[in-house]
Amino acid sequence: MSMAEDLHLEEQRPERMTLSIGPHHPATHGVLRVKLELEGETVVKAEPETGFLHTGIEKTAEHLTWNQATTVMDRMDYLSPISNNTGYVMAVEKLLGIEDRIPEKARVTRVILLELNRVASHLVGLGTGGLDYGNIGTPIFWAFELRDRILDIFEHTTGQRMNPSYMRVGGLAYDLPHNFKEMVEDFLKVAPGRIQELKDVMLHNPIFVDRAKGVSVITYEQALRYGLTGRNLRVTGSDYDVRKYYPYLGYENYDFKVPVYTDGDSWSRVAITFDEMFESLKIIRQALDNLPWDDRYIIDDRKLVLPPKQEVKHSMEALIHHFKLVHHGFDVPAGEVYVSIESPRGEIGFYVVSDGGNKPMRVRVRPPSFYAVYSLPVLLEGHLLSDMVGAIATIDPVFGEVDR
């Protein structure tokens, strides 16, 4: 090639521009910075950068007793605090060797709350994602109205709409309210219809279809390489779901399907979310029908659980147990465990180490959102800048657990 031809090609090559999106930008769904290299409107290179929301939750847990650490686990995936609570206490229960002694009422209640929280979390992602795709108004209002019904159940049951810290090692913090079943029944009556309406509005919107179909595609091999789990993996043809592959809390006894898509695009990530919510409603229905109302809500073990107040007033032994648990907590045998559950965003795992004391020696969390965020180069490169907003919305990360 002559020098003249080389210069001519150089003049024709579009100029590249570096653009920084975030960390304070509504489209990033949190404090995320994405450094983009653009040729015109096309993303040539994408580099996600996290760490702006670091809260030191794992380190904080090392300075709290085993039960106290439950309260900080809520703050990671703040849209799904029940998942954080449950995964952590299950790890501690495994260290103690009491996982088979957890009362059935506590196990079934955990399942109901986990699935309610899954639906609530998905509704946030769908509502805000609808805004990102230009579907202003209807999706977010419908989604948040239905989510508000779930938060009412949480508030009535746990005392908090968010960050309830309701799980305890051995069971639940306190018993269910007398009208718990009625509140969940009322929700189950309206939820299927509302979710179907939201699905019709979003998935059949021609603008959304044009912007999401075949956009931000990730293959099964790429998803595995980036460590994706949950919906972000299941849209690539995999049926991996912790509830099916490694059942916990009796999930093997519930009749539900794991939705699977194969296109791996943004449209599929939204469509599978609706399918998962319908399956969650089926699980809630079955769990509610089999809830042993008169069973204990927490393990009967004075070394681990506070004695009833009336007992403390009349029994010196109960008073001693109460004092010991409040001021010192309980000791956990030395050892290490890894326990994972299926959160709304995928497999959230807890690696917990005990040195035999009353506090964790180490708590390491495997957050599914972290892996989803760092798959953004695959989802963005080769697509338009405007597709970035939708791609981030459909992987649905929560940065409390990314940076923890």
Curated annotation (Swiss-Prot):
The keyword NAD applies. Gene3D superfamilies: Cytochrome-c3 Hydrogenase, chain B. Signal peptide: none annotated. It is a peripheral membrane protein. It holds the Pfam family Complex1_49kDa. It is an enzyme of class 7 (translocase). Its EC number is 7.1.1.-. It is found in: Cell membrane. Belongs to the complex I 49 kDa subunit family. This is NADH-quinone oxidoreductase subunit D 1. It comes from Symbiobacterium thermophilum (strain DSM 24528 / JCM 14929 / IAM 14863 / T). The lineage of its organism: Bacteria, Bacillati, Bacillota, Clostridia, Eubacteriales.
